[in-house]
Amino acid sequence: MRRLRKPPGLFRRIASLTMLAWVLGFLWFALLLPQPADDRTTDGIVVVTGGGGRIPRALTELRAGHARKLLIAGVDREVKPGDFAAEYGVEPRLLQCCITLGYDSVDTRSNGLEAARWVAAQRLHSIRLITTDWHMRRAAFDLAAALPDD
């Protein structure tokens, strides 16, 4: 006597579809990561802290003349400008004229708000955002949401 198989239950179908959607979403995310910006000049650079290499990259872009102003958002309140300059080899003249240490943000959303205030205060029209590739979409989204629509 042959046993009839019971069709998969609703729970298994939903779980399978959920897993498939997650895998496809992850593949989309991983394969379409944003690429580094070209050498185009912008008015300013915004770098959000949190990972190695971001600040040195921003300083390289600033020194190369790809922007005239730099905001480093999310700096710990314990970090003093002199300590920052010593850590990253920043000349006092460059620190004074061109670099703003932003102490107001603690997460990606507040990075966007802090950066938007800085962009408005500096009257900048174009900016370059520096963060990690996997963080770029979220950081760009939060920054765009905080900037005015003009």
Language-model-detected regions and their locations in the chain:
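A structural signal for short, hydrophobic/glycine-enriched beta-strand patches
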Residues: 30-150
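N-terminal type II signal-anchor transmembrane helix
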Residues: 2-36
